[in-house]
UniProtKB/Swiss-Prot annotation:
Family of this protein: Belongs to the universal ribosomal protein uL3 family.
UniProt PTM: Methylated by PrmB.
InterPro entries documented for this protein: Ribosomal_uL3 (IPR000597), Ribosomal_uL3_bac/org-type (IPR019927), Ribosomal_uL3_CS (IPR019926), Transl_B-barrel_sf (IPR009000)
N5-methylglutamine: modified positions: 153
GO biological process: translation
Protein name: Large ribosomal subunit protein uL3
Keywords on record: Methylation, Ribonucleoprotein, Ribosomal protein, RNA-binding, rRNA-binding
Function per UniProt: One of the primary rRNA binding proteins, it binds directly near the 3'-end of the 23S rRNA, where it nucleates assembly of the 50S subunit.
UniProt source species: Marinobacter nauticus (strain ATCC 700491 / DSM 11845 / VT8)
The encoding gene: rplC
HAMAP family listed in its UniProt record: Ribosomal_uL3_B
PROSITE patterns named among the record's database cross-references: RIBOSOMAL_L3
Gene Ontology molecular functions: rRNA binding; structural constituent of ribosome
Subunit structure: Part of the 50S ribosomal subunit. Forms a cluster with proteins L14 and L19.
């Protein structure tokens, strides 16, 4: 299925296999995702299930959003997310229903989407792994400078996309083909092998792997 869930990164730990091997895992807390809308080909041009999770104070929900949540009969959440549906998929879903960690199973391969940690304005050495220039040998000002960023009269410009200093992090990042080590339906937890983008407490979307 292409249906995933939205959870929160709880942190990292390790678990041990039967052979005694230690596996680093990310723990993702997945509260039941409340279905707010089912999009159809006839009304929206594509099929998708829209969900929300968490809660938000009523004073922070505008009238349009409040009406949208009320129509589905669900509590206002901290955001809305969509999962595309293939033909014949999600026929058993309905607005007001819930998606839980039970949509996944142990050993399944998934993609994790999160917002990476913001690093602020960074130079080329940190942002792009540029090599540093000489510390001595006559170099007194350009230790971490990028060096030449172009050529001469031809082309007479700096090409678009040139790697330079700038804002680093705080961008949507997808890590593909992570394995679900354990599904804990009782405590609404997913244990995913390896690292997942973002800070502890950040929202993470877990969905079946595209390239598995």
């Amino acid at each position: 299925m292409a249906i995933g869930v939205v959870g929160r990164k709880a942190g990292m730990t390790r678990i041990f296999t039967d052979e005694g091997q230690a596996l680093p895992v990310t723990v993702i807390e997945v509260e039941p995702n409340r279905i707010t809308q089912l999009k159809t080909l006839e009304s929206d041009g594509y099929r998708a299930v829209q969900v929300t999770v968490g809660s938000r104070r009523s004073s922070r929900v505008n009238k349009a959003a409040a009406g949208h949540f009320a129509k589905a009969g669900v509590e206002a959440g901290r955001g809305v997310w969509e999962f595309r549906l293939a033909d014949g998929e999600g026929e058993d879903l309905a607005a007001g229903g819930e998606l839980t960690v039970s949509v996944f199973e142990d050993g399944q391969v998934v993609d994790a989407v999160g917002q990476s940690k913001g690093k602020g304005f960074q130079g080329g050495v940190k942002r792009w792994n540029f090599s540093m220039q000489d510390a001595t040998h006559g170099n007194s000002l350009s230790h971490r400078a990028p060096g030449s960023i172009g050529q001469n009269q031809t082309p007479g410009k700096v090409f678009k996309g040139k790697k330079m200093a700038g804002q680093m992090g705080n961008a949507q990042v997808t890590v593909q083909n992570l394995k679900i080590v354990r599904v804990d339906a009782e405590r609404n937890l997913l244990l995913v092998s390896g690292a997942v983008p973002g800070a502890t407490g950040g929202d993470v979307v877990i969905k079946p792997a595209v390239k598995a």
